[in-house]
Amino acid sequence: WWTLWRAIKPELERLAADETRFAGVTSLGVDEHIWHHGDPRRKGPRELTGMVDLTRDEDGRVHARLLDLVPGRSKKAYADWLTQRAEAFRAGIQIAARDPFRGYKSAIDDELAEATAVLDAFHVVKLGTQAMDEVRRRVQQDTTGHRGRNGDPLYGIQRLLRAGAENLTD
């Protein structure tokens, strides 16, 4: 491992220092990554903030491309990364996708004033599913007086409610 690392590290550092990788980014995504790999007693960041290019190609498809990872999960970690980018990069960002973490929204408001902040699709679906489950549980409790049990109609339709329309049949 160490022999391989010594061989590729200079090239990785050269690529990481190349600012041209930020050219043409108009849609920027940010999300955290919790690092669980390896021995938990080892040093190093446990939470990382990842920035991803979500710009669509000429066919309208997104080919998500990792731009960078920085230690921490905070407004400061993201805002510092943004301020280290060129003004032209920040001015070119039209859409800033994020998870519901308020710190990322604050950094976008402070550093990407012209960008439209949106929740990423994963978190929109997750929040919608959670809201639907809460309503289903509340209706179950109000109508039957107990939590859902096997055989209860609202308990039995959980998977149906979570299924995508493309997976449903008549």
Q: Would you name each region that the model predicts?
A:
Residues 6-97, 102-107:
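RNase H-like nuclease fold core
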Residues 99-102, 109-153:
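Conserved beta-strand -> loop -> alpha-helix junction used to position metal-binding or nucleic-acid-contacting
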Residues 2:
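Key DNA-contact positions within bacterial/archaeal DNA-binding proteins
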Residues 9-13, 56, 113, 130-140, ...:
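Non-catalytic alpha-helical coupling and interface elements of nucleotide-dependent molecular machines
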